[in-house]
């Protein structure tokens, strides 16, 4: 998983 994916999930 990329940092962007983790950020996206955390954002929601």
From Swiss-Prot:
GO cellular component, one term: extracellular region
Keywords linked to the UniProt accession: Cell wall, Glycosyltransferase, Secreted, Transferase
GO molecular function, one term: glycosyltransferase activity
Domain of life: Eukaryota
Broad enzyme group: transferase
Signal peptide interval: none
Localization per Swiss-Prot or TrEMBL: Secreted, Cell wall
Enzyme Commission designation: 2.4.-.-
Similarity comment text for this entry: Belongs to the UDP-glycosyltransferase family.
Official protein name in the record: Putative glycosyltransferase
UniProt source species: Taxus baccata
């Amino acid at each position: 998983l990329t940092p962007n994916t983790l950020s996206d999930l955390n954002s929601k």
